[in-house]
Amino acid sequence: MICRLHPGLRSEVLDLPQAIEHDRKLAREAGIDDIVTHRAGDALTDELGTDYDVIFLGNIVHHFAPEQNLALLRRAKNALTPRGTIAIWEVEQPGPGAEADIVGDAFALYFRLTSTSRVYTAEESAGWLSATGYEDVQVSRSSMSPGGVLIAGRSAK
């Protein structure tokens, strides 16, 4: 929908092969299939491409171990234009000593019980961006999406 709000923008979605047809169907139903393309692949191993102004990692880093996320962020930096933006959207795990957060705590428990995934703190994700050479790292939370957090930075290259 960001592309609809900003004419001239185009989007390419990289998703697992088993999700692509469903993704395309949703794009058709939303009337955005003319500006959103889909490509089947694995974010950890497949080519990410080049010359992107923005890379948005939406609800993906919780599936990976910290070392995998560091590798993904390094690869993403190589796919960005100079001063391109990386943005991570995730459910946030409340940090030590933080007030209880029903959304973050529930997701953290769910992932621990059902998979090898886990929810990370915003500080962990921001630390990965800094460790992989991104600059101007910022963390934003919205009351419109309880438990959600956006961590963004810019490529220094």
Give the ranges of each region predicted by the language model:
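Alpha-helical subdomain
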Residues: 1-157
